[in-house]
Amino acid sequence: MRTSFVVGATLLGLACGGGKATRSGASDQTPQWLADGTGAIRGEGGKRLQGVGVASAVADPKARRRQADAAAREQLQTAVDALALALAKMSESTQPNLAPTTTGIARKAAGQVAAIRDHWVTPDGDERALAVVELDALRRALQAGDGDDRIRGEMAANVERAFDRVAER
């Protein structure tokens, strides 16, 4: 009877112990995206813009996650803005104040395809979030989006070159 209880308690403990979002703080388990940081990233799955956000000193896990997600989206926005600026510099358009136009078009297109991809919680309770825009998805969103057709088409055609310029920095 005592053995059955010990075995049952052990099995119950093992069954209930999984599924945590928290990972060890050991450097070999730190996600690669955390080391890559925010910006234009060339990865195994292709080219992408990513933002890494951090939430610290938030006791409530749901609030911490929302804060990390918001910070990641904000960081992603800086990467999208850098790409839009590179696209504006490459443009052949003679339209005055082209940078705000390209930034608006790029932000809208990126907003349609951006996604929070991952989270990582450190042993001390800080949470990191990863927001991503895949370059191919951004190109398709630029082609199908709103705004001046000629500028959108030019942006979609030059997005690869602009990405390469931003990634060099």
Predicted regions and their residues:
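Domain-level marker for long, solvent-exposed, non-transmembrane regions
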Residues: 16-169
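Sec-dependent bacterial lipoprotein signal peptides
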Residues: 1-15
